[in-house]
Amino acid sequence: MDVSQTIVLALIQGLSEFLPISSSAHLILVPKLTNWTDQGLIFDVVVHMGTLSAVIFYYQAMIRSLFFDFYYSIIKRQIIGQSKLAWGVLLGTIPIGLVGMIFKDFVAVDLRSIEIIAYTTLVFGLLLGFASWFNHKNKNPKSTISWIDVSFVSMMQILALIPGTSRSGITITACMLVGLSRKLSIQFSFLLSIPVITLSLILMLIDLYHQTQLVNVSLLVLGFVISTISAYATIIFVIRLIDMVGMTPFVIYRLILGVFLFFL
């Protein structure tokens, strides 16, 4: 890897992790379109650490509050403050974690074709558009999440294992389909990313333990810094943009990208 490849791939990870356009799809497509060599597992670990750091830093106050509400809900055995949201984040991670571990090799080898990415980009782009329209028509969106909502969103999140789906895209879609407000949909989706990214990091570190790779520390540091800053900026941008215009720009982008991929 050289500096230009490091910058581009770190930016892609940082920008696309929290945009509903699929970071994994773009990280697969760019090297294929540019004929770059594989960036290596160590680089993947580092840029994922960057995006994880960004979302934790952005939501640090809420995470602290959720942690204490979660803790006291266990002690007192009742819902305390936003403990239901905290439990939702925890329980909502279990399905994708289990399925991801069981089918890890299948996903990594058999679901990375451009054709599959093209289909998922289009199909889930259309679903995102429908969910956005449904949310716009919903005059009484829910400001709290129920256990049924958590169950539905967590099941839908499993689809994010397929490249091109977008974890943030499918979870925001699911949240809006069950009637959650746009604000809560984004919030729950981004909070769900914390344990999901953490789990993927653990799996990558396990794989990394069995490998021997030469590393360029300066490029890894550069990748971490760029992915962290770009991810943090993206979180701010996405929240403001969706609040103003909804999901339309992302739906249009996904449809254009999906059609383009079919001609490759």
From Swiss-Prot:
* Enzyme's top EC category: hydrolase
> Known catalysed reaction(s)?
di-trans,octa-cis-undecaprenyl diphosphate + H2O = di-trans,octa-cis-undecaprenyl phosphate + phosphate + H(+)
Report the main location listed first in the record: membrane
List cellular component terms (GO).
Answer: plasma membrane
Keyword Transmembrane helix part of the UniProt annotation: yes
List, in alphabetical order, the GO biological process terms annotated in this UniProt record.
cell wall organization; peptidoglycan biosynthetic process; regulation of cell shape; response to antibiotic
As one GO molecular function, the record gives:
undecaprenyl-diphosphatase activity
- What positions belong to coiled-coil segments? none
Q: Which InterPro entries does the UniProt record give?
A: UppP (IPR003824)
Give one Pfam family, short name only: BacA
**Protein name, UniProt field:** Undecaprenyl-diphosphatase
Species of the source:
Vesicomyosocius okutanii subsp. Calyptogena okutanii (strain HA)
The primary gene name is: uppP
